[in-house]
């Protein structure tokens, strides 16, 4: 039947895990009106990460100026202006949560002259001022390839600079039409070559790519100097999003991990539920 969604296999039936920290974080985020990608992107690891006392903060609101067909975050051409108090609120939440490692990400803000880069730097500075011992990973957008905006963020020297290629180049037109595969690779190369940053990227599988295409993209990432990799199963957020072509079995994720480690990636997280920030900081 056209439009029929695939039935999830047994290995994708996640057992909910919650601890006392889960409720504490939920209350804190509600009280401070902060956004997390955990909730906005419907991450399957939300319960696990929150129960471990970690979260990924979503900067610049929860509405994106782009409409990637895989993403659950809402889209709008002219979102509300950035909240100038958000950097301080996030820094306060990091302190209250006693985080040892912080992950920051953001929506695309193509409506802003700098894509939100200054807001990024203000948030990073605020966190480092209030929690100087906390590690910091930044999962950045492409800033439309604006070198000045990219350098503004990279000059703050996060411990890890993460930028996802998301999928193989053949699928970009249908999955990520407002982005460029080669531009994403150049961002990772810039972070390492010009700034000496540890770089990381992530891919989703199950969208129609072949095993060989994923391996080829891994090679592209290594050529760009990327040393850390995440690979996870694409899960269709709603019926209107890009359909799942297939559910990749666990043993295929193991094969991806072996291929990546053989290429020289220092850290590889590969599995059905893996997402960009899954176990972030565990390799630090």
Swiss-Prot record:
GO CC annotations, alphabetized: cytoplasm
SUPFAM superfamilies recorded: Radical SAM enzymes (SSF102114)
Catalytic activity: [[Fe-S] cluster scaffold protein carrying a second [4Fe-4S](2+) cluster] + N(6)-octanoyl-L-lysyl-[protein] + 2 oxidized [2Fe-2S]-[ferredoxin] + 2 S-adenosyl-L-methionine + 4 H(+) = [[Fe-S] cluster scaffold protein] + N(6)-[(R)-dihydrolipoyl]-L-lysyl-[protein] + 4 Fe(3+) + 2 hydrogen sulfide + 2 5'-deoxyadenosine + 2 L-methionine + 2 reduced [2Fe-2S]-[ferredoxin]
InterPro entries from the UniProt entry: Aldolase_TIM, Elp3/MiaA/NifB-like_rSAM, Lipoyl_synth, rSAM
Main location as per UniProt: cytoplasm
EC number, UniProt record: 2.8.1.8
Phosphoprotein recorded as keyword: no
Binding residues annotated for [4Fe-4S] cluster 2, in chain numbering: 64, 68, 71
Required co-factors: [4Fe-4S] cluster
EC class name: transferase
Keywords: 4Fe-4S, Cytoplasm, Iron, Iron-sulfur, Metal-binding, S-adenosyl-L-methionine, Transferase
GO MF annotations in UniProt: 4 iron, 4 sulfur cluster binding; lipoate synthase activity; metal ion binding
Source organism superkingdom: Bacteria
Subcellular location, record wording: Cytoplasm
HAMAP family in UniProt: Lipoyl_synth (MF_00206)
Stated family: Belongs to the radical SAM superfamily. Lipoyl synthase family.
Protein name: Lipoyl synthase
Gene: lipA
């Amino acid at each position: 039947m056209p439009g029929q969604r695939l039935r999830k296999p047994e290995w994708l039936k996640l057992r909910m895990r919650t601890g006392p920290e889960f409720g504490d974080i939920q209350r804190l985020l509600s009280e401070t009106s902060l956004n997390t990608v955990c909730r906005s992107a419907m991450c399957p690891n939300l319960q696990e990460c929150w129960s471990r006392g970690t979260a990924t903060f979503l900067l610049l609101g929860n509405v994106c100026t782009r409409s990637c067909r895989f993403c659950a975050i809402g889209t709008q051409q002219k979102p509300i202006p950035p909240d100038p108090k958000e950097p301080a609120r996030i820094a306060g939440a990091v302190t209250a949560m006693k985080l040892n490692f912080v992950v920051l990400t953001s929506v695309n803000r193509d409506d802003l002259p700098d894509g939100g880069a200054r807001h990024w730097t203000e948030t990073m500075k605020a966190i480092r001022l209030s929690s100087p011992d906390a590690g910091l990973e930044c999962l950045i957008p492409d800033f439309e390839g604006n070198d000045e905006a990219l350098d503004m963020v990279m000059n703050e020297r996060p411990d890890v600079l993460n930028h996802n290629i998301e999928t193989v180049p053949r699928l970009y037109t249908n999955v990520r039409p407002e982005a460029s595969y080669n531009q994403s690779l150049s961002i990772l190369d810039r972070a390492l070559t010009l700034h000496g940053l540890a770089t990381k990227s992530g891919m989703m599988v199950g969208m129609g790519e072949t095993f060989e295409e994923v391996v080829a993209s891994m090679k592209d990432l290594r050529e760009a100097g990327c040393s850390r990799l995440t690979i996870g199963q694409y899960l269709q957020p709603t019926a209107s999003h890009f359909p799942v072509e297939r559910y990749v079995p666990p043993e295929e994720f193991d094969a991806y991990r072996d291929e990546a480690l053989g290429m020289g990636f220092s850290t590889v997280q590969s599995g059905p539920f893996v997402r960009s920030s899954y176990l972030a900081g565990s390799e630090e």
